[in-house]
Structures are given as structure tokens and as C-alpha cells.
């Protein structure tokens, strides 16, 4: 049975829609290749994603003893986190809602044989 190595980051201050654009670049790649792609991706969400991938890689080495050269990104996804809401003043005495969306990032690695 294959073991899944997981890492998760919660309440990342980027919307899940924007994070998913970057996640699609690294899904299915080897971990070292994924970190290189994230390093040169000009998107603000690439920083937290690379930290989560590196954390999952460290979990695999420390807890299970798997070589980092054999790991690949099996699953990676972003879910919506709580949205911070506040009101701005609009025309005619109305309020306009401002939403600051955030996301949870989950990375699952597996060992490729």
C-alpha cells in the first residue's frame, strides 16, 4: 500500500480561484521540478504554495524516510477559507461590500517507483 504524505496551509490570503491557476502548473510533477517551476512563476500565490510543497517534502524525509528524488505531487488542491467582509460607503447612502477571500492549500505527495 502506498503512503500519502500530506501538508496543509490554512488561511492563505489569496483567493482559491487565483491559487488554482498556480496549482495546475505543478500537479503530477516531481517535487524538485515543481519547486523550480514555482520559483520562477510570477504569481504572488507561488510563494506560499512552494512552502507547503517543501513542508510536505520535509515530512516525507523526516517521518517516513523517503528520498526526495522519488517524490511527486500526487494531489494538490485549494479550498475556500473564511472570507473577511467589511462595508464601504457607496452612492446614495448605501454600503458596498468588500470581500477579502482566502484559501486552504493541501498537498499530497507519493513515492514513484
Where is each model-derived feature located?
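Structured, basic alpha/beta domains of bacterial-type, RNA-associated proteins
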Residues: 1-14, 21-25, 29-113
Amino acid at each position: 500500500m502506498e503512503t500519502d504524505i500530506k501538508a496543509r496551509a490554512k488561511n492563505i490570503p489569496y483567493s482559491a480561484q487565483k491559487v488554482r491557476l498556480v496549482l495546475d502548473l505543478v500537479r503530477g510533477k516531481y517535487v524538485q521540478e515543481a519547486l523550480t517551476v514555482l520559483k520562477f512563476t510570477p504569481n504572488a500565490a507561488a510563494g506560499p504554495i512552494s512552502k507547503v510543497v517543501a513542508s510536505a517534502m520535509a515530512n516525507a524525509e523526516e517521518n517516513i524516510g523517503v528520498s526526495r528524488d522519488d517524490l511527486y505531487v500526487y494531489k494538490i488542491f485549494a479550498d475556500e477559507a473564511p472570507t473577511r467582509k467589511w462595508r464601504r460607503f457607496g452612492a446614495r447612502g448605501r454600503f458596498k461590500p468588500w470581500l477579502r477571500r482566502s484559501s486552504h492549500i493541501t498537498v499530497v505527495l507519493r513515492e514513484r517507483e
